[in-house]
């Protein structure tokens, strides 16, 4: 059973703010230039807001000018999973937490070297490692 299946909708709503729930569980998107981390460049690691899984290292974060936190690679090859997103009449690659299926954002092929990728991530879906997460891995 995946971690996502262990929690029902009521528990996710209890543990997340309404905005976090809309983005993480309903695949929403925060408005550009409004998220907590779009201009954050402290060292550290970014974890999944829902389950605490390590997702991105701050040293791979860059200013893409798009208004969302952007990274050129995940922390590990297995941190995230990708799937086709055809919502809103577009073809995009959605990025989700591999552990709990939290919607993180999208990945695009207009990023910097060394990968050429831009993981465009909602601030509401992540937390910097020095901050509290809604669920810690031990509670899943």
Curated annotation (Swiss-Prot):
Database matches in InterPro entries: Met_Sox_Rdtase_MsrB, Met_Sox_Rdtase_MsrB_dom, Mss4-like_sf
Cofactor-binding details, from the entry: Binds 1 zinc ion per subunit. The zinc ion is important for the structural integrity of the protein.
Gene Ontology MF annotations: peptide-methionine (R)-S-oxide reductase activity; zinc ion binding
Binding residues annotated for Zn(2+), in chain numbering: 48, 51, 97, 100
Domain named MsrB: residues: 9-131
PROSITE patterns associated with the record: MSRB
Any one of the GO CC terms: cytoplasm
Pfam families per record: SelR
Name of the top EC class for this enzyme: oxidoreductase
Domain of life: Bacteria
GO annotation terms (biological process): protein repair; response to oxidative stress
Cofactor: Zn(2+)
Residues the record marks as active site: 120 (nucleophile)
EC number: 1.8.4.12
Catalysis: reaction(s): L-methionyl-[protein] + [thioredoxin]-disulfide + H2O = L-methionyl-(R)-S-oxide-[protein] + [thioredoxin]-dithiol
Gene3D superfamilies: Peptide methionine sulfoxide reductase (2.170.150.20)
The entry's keywords: Metal-binding, Oxidoreductase, Zinc
Family: Belongs to the MsrB Met sulfoxide reductase family.
Name by which UniProt lists this protein: Peptide methionine sulfoxide reductase MsrB
Organism: Cellvibrio japonicus (strain Ueda107) (Pseudomonas fluorescens subsp. cellulosa)
Taxonomic lineage from the root: Bacteria, Pseudomonadati, Pseudomonadota, Gammaproteobacteria, Cellvibrionales
Gene, per the UniProt record: msrB
